[in-house]
């Protein structure tokens, strides 16, 4: 998030819709928030002992008039760890609703699929740094500047998302997190972003009481890959986003005393379908099964099993440079989430546990949140990481932290 992220298109959107806001029912709301995260193991690579230290304010405008709606959320923050003053348009879009179709244009947050911190068909950008630094979970998702068209014939419902400009996921900052780098001595880095946008389609309907959906996506990997200019004596590393298509499906519904969800997708690595380019992720099949139920009053439990299968594994092994960590053909992950409410539902304890049985990676996040009033709440939690030094969570094992969130809403 830069110093100012209110792009001209966003300003044009506000100006264009000002007459709507003037004639519509308008709701204004806001919050003030303090967010602190402190290391418990060692200092950051940049030498500081805080993962996060900021004050933040959000202003929200929601205007509705007839078939039209305007929503805008703007964040303003001050970061004490070197980023200083920041502002960002979190969401800003216009809705139009007709009888059997609707349209949304502008910056919007889109979520597909059923995974809990495990993503199969949810191909839209994330903020992984926000999750690992103990920010509120709503900041895990990043908005995209897109047009979303919904159509609702009798056969099924359709949702088409077209973004003219690609937006990447935010990865942890190497000055705040101990991120694995196979070429740390090469400091000359160049980042290449796709010069075109991406498009996705979701088709969904009810089948015998179950919510079923098909997904299509054509775009790019949200997290970058790295390619050195030479394998023998590299002087420059280029970060780029490989081309990607995703074909997926999901189904969810009642099963026994809970809700069962099944999800799968094929990740087509269009830039390297043979699997011989070590810098481009191989094509994958991803499968997810989840079950959520309530064994007692104010208590909920959920379990997930997630697996990834790497295609063209022999070609991947043959093309992998010497000294690089080796991924396995199969990856297996299990997760558990428990949530318990106390004190007339004003106190909430939650814990999320993720364990990759193939790489020994783990991520543990217990949190205690208390609502002091209807407008003020606070939360304290812990992020624990572990596993192999090159694993998704193992690389972050020095980054264990305790975080505190306090928010006043008005």
Predicted ranges, named:
Residues 24-41, 63, 68-72, 349:
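Transmembrane beta-strand segments of Gram-negative outer membrane beta-barrel proteins
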Residues 57-63, 91-96, 147-151, 201-205, ...:
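Residues on the lipid-exposed face of transmembrane beta-strands in outer-membrane beta-barrel proteins
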Residues 252-274, 278-354:
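Detector for outer-membrane/organellar transmembrane beta-barrel domains
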Residues 396-410:
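Outer-membrane beta-barrel "beta-signal"
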């Amino acid at each position: 998030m830069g110093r100012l992220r209110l792009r001209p298109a966003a300003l044009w959107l506000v100006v264009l819709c000002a007459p709507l806001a003037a004639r519509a029912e308008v709701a204004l709301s806001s919050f003030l928030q303090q967010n602190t995260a402190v290391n418990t193991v060692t200092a950051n690579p940049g030498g500081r002992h805080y993962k996060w230290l900021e004050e933040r304010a959000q202003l929200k405008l929601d205007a509705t008039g007839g078939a039209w709606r305007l929503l805008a959320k703007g964040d303003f923050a001050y970061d004490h760890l070197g980023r200083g003053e920041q502002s960002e348009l979190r969401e800003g879009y216009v809705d139009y609703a007709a009888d059997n179709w609707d349209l949304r244009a502008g910056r919007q947050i889109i979520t597909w699929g059923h995974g809990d911190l495990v993503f199969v068909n949810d191909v839209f950008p994330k903020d992984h740094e926000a999750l690992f630094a103990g920010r509120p979970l709503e900041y895990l998702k990043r908005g995209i500047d897109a047009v979303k068209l919904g159509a609702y014939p009798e056969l099924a419902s359709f949702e088409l998302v077209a973004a003219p400009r690609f937006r990447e996921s935010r990865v942890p900052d190497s000055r705040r997190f101990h991120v694995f780098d196979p070429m740390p001595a090469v400091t000359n880095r160049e980042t290449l972003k796709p010069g075109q946008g991406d498009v996705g389609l979701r088709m969904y309907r009810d089948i015998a009481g179950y919510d079923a959906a098909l997904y299509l996506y054509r775009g790019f990997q949200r997290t970058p890959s790295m390619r050195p200019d030479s394998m023998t004596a590299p002087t420059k590393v280029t970060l780029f986003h490989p081309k990607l298509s995703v074909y997926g499906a999901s189904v969810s519904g009642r099963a026994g005393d809970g809700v069962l969800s099944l999800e799968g997708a094929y990740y087509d690595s269009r830039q390297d379908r043979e699997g011989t380019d070590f810098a481009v992720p191989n094509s994958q099949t991803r499968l997810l099964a989840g079950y959520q139920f309530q064994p007692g009053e104010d208590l909920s439990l959920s379990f997930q099993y997630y697996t990834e299968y790497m295609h063209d594994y022999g070609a991947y092994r043959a093309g992998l440079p010497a000294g690089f960590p080796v991924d396995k053909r199969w990856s297996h992950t299990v997760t558990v989430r428990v949530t318990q409410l106390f004190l007339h539902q004003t106190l909430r304890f939650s814990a999320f546990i993720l364990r990759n049985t193939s790489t020994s990676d783990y991520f543990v996040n217990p949190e205690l949140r208390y609502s002091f009033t209807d407008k003020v709440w606070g939360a304290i939690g812990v992020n624990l990481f572990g596993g192999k030094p090159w694993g998704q969570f193992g690389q972050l094992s020095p980054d264990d932290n305790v975080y505190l969130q306090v928010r006043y809403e008005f």
